[in-house]
Amino acid sequence: AEKFYPTYSQFGDEMTMNDALFERIKTVYDNRESLEPDQRRAVEEYYKSFVRNGALLDADKKEELKAVNTELANLYLTFNKNLLNATNAFEIVVEDSTRLSGLPQSSIAQAADEAKSRGMEGKWVFTLHAPSRLPLLQYADDRDLRQQMYQGYTTLAFDGENSNQPVINKILQARTRKAALLGFKDYGSYMTDNVMAKTVDNAEELLMKIWRPAVARVHEEVAEMQAYANAHGDNITIAPWDYYYYAEKV
């Protein structure tokens, strides 16, 4: 995959920036009024796709865009590789069986098998992979375990040798260059131009219409969880790593 994806990206560039191919598409596009509605729609979409991918740029800018696209393809690969490596590197090792309180037997057995496969027979190992992560967040009575898992997941590839922070910075810079080459003020404008929202402001407005009631509902749920915790003598303030656990109880 590491070798194939940049090659695939380059192949796409060679196709969408091929002058002869685009001329054929443009000829049909310029005479699209004679087509059936579905044919006209298909031609318009093809034409727009080619333009969005640099078909109208001059030769020098096409080469620059190709270089940016190849850079982005490699950065995306690095980003995903860092995520995978960071995921595989994370583990929570439990040595005391009392800390497994609340967990289903299937989860405990899986953790024991994972420990055995890592040469730690007699212990339990939990990982960031969903079958291991989710039951722990939902059912583990040990709050410290839940906190470890939650923070490990939400800071994945945040620092260390698998940090994606420098990769993200490079992606942002490359996307900015790509948008500028294609005549957009920023990458957000480039992306929204091709969808129903059309502008970044419209997209943000739509997201906020969803976000505000969603946040309000979460506050209600957390209040219910806090009331449950208080009623059962749990001397805590509900934190993010408590959410799934108490959601199972209220």
Each language-model region and where it sits:
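N-terminal helix-rich structural modules
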Residues: 1-106, 110
